[in-house]
């Protein structure tokens, strides 16, 4: 029985996700698999590649032939070089940077807020500004009348 290591497609229309499976070479693309040995999500940045290295080495050792896309994935993870005995068995797989936890972000924001000086609001509220303008307008005619009376005397 000819065995291949190939990709089966999962996911939505524009978001493909693949499983790396070992299957009979005559089965359909998404047909029955003998074993699932990994997954590949090409749309993530960097692409998510997980391969069970031990099982991949076993299947390559017993004669399973990888398809071209799977061979490229195995080269990235370093499993192909390990199987062939070539240098560079560590692979070129890029790992996504770990996101800081929400608790750490909150603690940093809290520490930054404590260090800032506490003061009045920079801009006054609009209601106060309107009230002050109304008072100033009411005082202006009274002051003008008082000044004109002082000038007359």
Curated annotation (Swiss-Prot):
Residue numbers spanned by region Disordered: 114-153
GO cellular component, one term: cytoplasm
PROSITE patterns named in the record: RIBOSOMAL_S16
One Pfam family it belongs to: Ribosomal_S16
Coiled-coil regions listed in the entry: none
Gene3D superfamilies assigned: 3.30.1320.10
Assigned keywords, A-Z: Ribonucleoprotein, Ribosomal protein
NCBIfam families with a match to the protein in the record: PRK14520.1, S16
Record field: compositional bias (Low complexity): 137-153
UniProt family annotation: Belongs to the bacterial ribosomal protein bS16 family.
Protein name (Swiss-Prot/TrEMBL): Small ribosomal subunit protein bS16
Biological processes, Gene Ontology terms: translation
HAMAP family associated with the record: Ribosomal_bS16
Regions crossing the membrane: none
Gene Ontology molecular functions: structural constituent of ribosome
């Amino acid at each position: 029985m000819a065995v291949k290591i190939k990709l089966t497609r999962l996911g939505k229309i524009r978001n493909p996700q693949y499983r790396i499976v070992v299957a009979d070479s005559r089965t359909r693309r998404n047909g029955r698999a003998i074993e699932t040995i990994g997954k590949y999500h090409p749309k993530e940045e960097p692409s998510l590649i997980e391969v069970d290295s031990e099982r991949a080495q076993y299947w390559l050792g017993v004669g399973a032939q990888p398809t071209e896309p799977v061979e490229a994935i195995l080269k990235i993870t370093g499993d192909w070089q390990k199987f062939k005995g070539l240098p560079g068995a560590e692979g070129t797989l890029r790992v996504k940077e770990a996101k800081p936890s929400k608790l750490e972000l909150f603690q940093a924001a809290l520490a930054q807020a404590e260090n800032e000086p506490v003061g009045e609001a920079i801009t006054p509220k609009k209601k106060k500004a309107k009230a002050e303008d109304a008072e100033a307008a009411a005082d202006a005619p009274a002051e003008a009348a008082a000044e004109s009376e002082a000038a007359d005397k």
